[in-house]
């Protein structure tokens, strides 16, 4: 990841896929319609889990445009690896990554660490919402790539998918990507138990901000390539 500090190193010390097409479920939105998405996603009751996830995804897309997603796209264009990702447009799915093969890799490799985390947490890379409300096709792919890389960050930091782990990771992502939704998600720390809030403020938040700012742009990591390499050496 360039020559900068690997973002997961602090957490660890303390404790060729084929190109594919961009998301196909994209919905063109009139400017005034898109501007209503944030308020709709915040005020509409979240009912079933899938609906709640869809509303959060829509809010993330609405707040990322027009500036922030272009900034992230430009960061990829400024990086040789980022440009390769934009050219290849790989997708992270259970099929493209060949999860059974990753399970066969030695413990401590990037691929085994990733799939072991998926299995432990009971999650799948196939559950990420498709980008629908970003009109620029390249920027829509950048947002999709950000979503699909999220579980790699979880796996390599060891942060679980409980609220405390999610909020900590969102704080890291905000410091690194500046996407507004990640920053707004940090306010969810107010809903944590008192002991969790204290731990978050004293340990997780400083770690997240320090390493998010210190690390190279994580969007430029071609995760499909170092799967067989040791985590510490990656």
From Swiss-Prot:
Keywords: Lyase, Membrane, Metal-binding, Mitochondrion, Mitochondrion inner membrane, Ubiquinone biosynthesis, Zinc. InterPro entries: Coq4, Coq4_euk. It is a peripheral membrane protein. Its EC number is 4.1.1.130. Zn(2+) binds at residues 150-151, 154, 166. Pfam families: Coq4. GO terms for cellular component: extrinsic component of mitochondrial inner membrane. One of its GO terms (biological process) is ubiquinone biosynthetic process. It comes from the Eukaryota. Residues 12-44 are annotated as: Disordered. Pathway: Cofactor biosynthesis; ubiquinone biosynthesis. It catalyses: a 4-hydroxy-3-methoxy-5-(all-trans-polyprenyl)benzoate + H(+) = a 2-methoxy-6-(all-trans-polyprenyl)phenol + CO2. Its main location: mitochondrion. It is found in: Mitochondrion inner membrane. Residues 13-44 have a biased composition (Low complexity). Belongs to the COQ4 family. This protein may be expected to contain an N-terminal transit peptide but none has been predicted. Lyase that catalyzes the C1-decarboxylation of 4-hydroxy-3-methoxy-5-(all-trans-polyprenyl)benzoic acid into 2-methoxy-6-(all-trans-polyprenyl)phenol during ubiquinone biosynthesis. Component of a multi-subunit COQ enzyme complex, composed of at least COQ3, COQ4, COQ5, COQ6, COQ7 and COQ9. This is Ubiquinone biosynthesis protein COQ4, mitochondrial. It comes from Chaetomium globosum (strain ATCC 6205 / CBS 148.51 / DSM 1962 / NBRC 6347 / NRRL 1970) (Soil fungus).
């Amino acid at each position: 990841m360039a020559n900068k500090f690997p973002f997961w190193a602090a957490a660890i010390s303390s404790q060729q896929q084929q190109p594919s097409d961009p998301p196909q479920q994209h919905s063109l939105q009139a400017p005034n319609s898109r501007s209503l998405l944030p308020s709709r996603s915040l005020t509409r009751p979240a009912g079933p889990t899938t609906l709640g996830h869809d509303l959060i995804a829509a809010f993330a897309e609405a707040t990322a445009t027009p500036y922030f997603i272009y900034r992230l796209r430009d960061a990829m264009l400024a990086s040789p690896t980022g440009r390769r990702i934009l050219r290849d447009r790989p997708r992270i799915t259970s099929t493209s990554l060949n999860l059974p093969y990753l399970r066969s890799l030695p413990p401590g490799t990037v691929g085994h660490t990733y799939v072991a985390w998926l299995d432990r947490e009971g999650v799948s890379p196939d559950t990420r919402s498709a980008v629908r409300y970003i009109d620029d096709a390249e920027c829509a792919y950048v947002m999709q790539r950000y979503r699909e890389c999220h579980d790699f960050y979880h796996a390599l930091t060891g942060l679980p998918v409980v609220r405390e782990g999610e909020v900590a990771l969102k704080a890291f992502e905000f410091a690194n990507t500046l996407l507004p939704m990640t920053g707004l998600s940090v306010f969810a720390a107010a809903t944590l138990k008192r002991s969790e809030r204290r731990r978050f403020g004293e340990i997780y938040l400083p770690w997240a901000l320090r390493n998010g700012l210190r690390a190279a742009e994580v969007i430029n990591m071609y995760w499909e390539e170092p799967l067989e390499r040791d985590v510490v050496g990656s």
